[in-house]
Amino acid sequence: MGEQQLILTNKLLEEMKLQDYQKDNTIYIDEDITSESIELWARQLKNLCNKQLSRPKEERSPVKLIINSAGGSARDTLYFIDLMEYYKKRDIEIYTYITAYAYSGAFKIGICGSKRFAYKHSELLCHQWNKFEYGVKTYQDTVNDRERNDRLYNELAEVIVSNTKITREMLDDYTKHNRDFVMTSKTALELSVIDEIVE
């Protein structure tokens, strides 16, 4: 009985979120980034942005992304960022709000907003992406993987460098020493990772 109630409660919360996002022009990025979660958020983003596109520019409202996520899939993250850029180029403003934390892919989505906000005690984390592999691979497989991995690393680095004051040298140094780049909201503001601290 308890498990059934939990499932019903979760379904009810999801339905409420789906209804509220249209009313508030707000999308909640509040779980791990997977192909499933990104597909949901992408549909919501397209829906909200297309509604704004149907209005005259002076009547448009910004779409808000409320971010509280530990990140996840790098390629799915880049897809969502591409979608954000598509609408930003069409004069749709997308505001990002980092609440408790934004790590990894969520960090990268956060820095791509038209305006970017975090709270006083928010924590942001930028790090090299991780990859999990299984099975036996040939030498050529590993060569091909290295090329793909290098390309993905460069794509992710470009997102960070082009949207903040974090330099490629800083990123490469953290990667070389296998360190996470953890930031307070104050440090994030100094590095142009965010534009404003909400207090």
Task: Label each PLM-derived region with a short phrase.
Residues 1-107, 111-199:
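N-terminal organellar transit peptides
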